[in-house]
């Protein structure tokens, strides 16, 4: 028999919001009777931007800014129909990007 898996991939700039959303998904899945693998932390993507501090002179004086993108992966093994319904109704934070693969 073919086992159905749901893979949920979460991305956010703030790791605290990401961990909170991950905990909500795990608790919802466990409450409805599904088994959960994860959350698995993926490597953080750091994107750096270097700009001149002064608009006129001092080329050597620069400032760096960075954006960190934190990622997590969850696998829900053998989800029940109640699990799918509960995950659809789940309201997550605005700063979290969610990708779901069946």
Swiss-Prot record:
Cellular component, GO annotation: ribonucleoprotein complex; ribosome
Listed GO biological process terms: translation
One Pfam family cited in the UniProt record for this chain: Ribosomal_S10
UniProt entry keywords in alphabetical sequence: Ribonucleoprotein, Ribosomal protein
MF GO annotations: structural constituent of ribosome; tRNA binding
InterPro entries noted in UniProt: Ribosomal_uS10 (IPR001848), Ribosomal_uS10_CS (IPR018268), Ribosomal_uS10_dom (IPR027486), Ribosomal_uS10_dom_sf (IPR036838)
Disulfide bonds: none
Function as written in the Swiss-Prot or TrEMBL entry: Involved in the binding of tRNA to the ribosomes.
HAMAP family xref list: Ribosomal_uS10
Subunit organization: Part of the 30S ribosomal subunit.
Family: Belongs to the universal ribosomal protein uS10 family.
Protein name: Small ribosomal subunit protein uS10
Organism of derivation: Phenylobacterium zucineum (strain HLK1)
